[in-house]
Amino acid sequence: MEKIHVLQKTRQRKETHGDRKTTQSNRGSTGSRNRTRTATRKRKGDSLNMAYVSLLGDSIIDNKVYVQPHELSVKEHLEEQSEYMFKQLAVDGHTTSDVLSFQLDKLPKLSTHKVLSIGGNDLLGQIYFLKNKEEFTVKEVMEQAVCKLAPIKDRYRTIVQNLSLQDSKILLCTVYEGNLLDDSLYSDIAFASKAMVSMLNDIIFSTAATYKVDVLELRNIFTTPEDYANPIEPSHKGGKKLASGIIEWVKSV
């Protein structure tokens, strides 16, 4: 932009001193054209260096159907808060299996940053054993939890391994605890489910350490009931906070 500003000043000087020799005017015109080409190349270079962020996962990102018509989804918040380019591959309802089967193959090769938020639906499919009325020891419950999380762990690590094959920055989002206390379906296991959420997040942090990628802790972002559109989906407010966290990360890496 500085070069464009200089070009404008050059033109002003040319108009003010129009009585200069023709040869000087021609040299000034040639210099102006050169500076114009330089400024154009600079603008094109800036566009090439623009962040291109791919968003993978589930409804934590693909939350458009859960916000009001006048409200913004996570992707819309991202686009409103920055000039970066965003490619949403995340799909409401998807699991780690779906990311492996449907999302990875669609990754743009030009992605400079990748954000992954997955695992919540996998967890929802497994926590119903906590509703079991049979009496189990703490040891038995923990053993069941570990067994149920094992295949999720394997798939999650495979996803991150595949993401790491491309030369780009990676951000893994943890799974938040949700607003389960206000939901009749989950209220009776709201506290017990936090243990499984913590176990899944341990997998995420461990995977991040293995592949040397970053983590965004969603439990520090979704902190109030207003952050949720329902017990488990981000609201307009929560989505805005998530978008801010993602943009801060893009700027920092």
Protein language model regions, located:
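Alpha-helical cap/lid subdomain in secreted, periplasmic
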Residues: 104-236, 240-253
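Low-complexity, intrinsically disordered Ser/Thr/Pro- and acidic-rich segments
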Residues: 34-40
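Short, solvent-exposed loop/turn segments at secondary-structure boundaries
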Residues: 65-69, 99-101, 228-231
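Intrinsic-disorder-associated, low-complexity terminal segments enriched in Asp/Asn/His/Tyr and depleted
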Residues: 19, 26, 34, 46-49
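Serine-esterase "nucleophile elbow" of acetyl-processing enzymes
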Residues: 43-94, 104-110
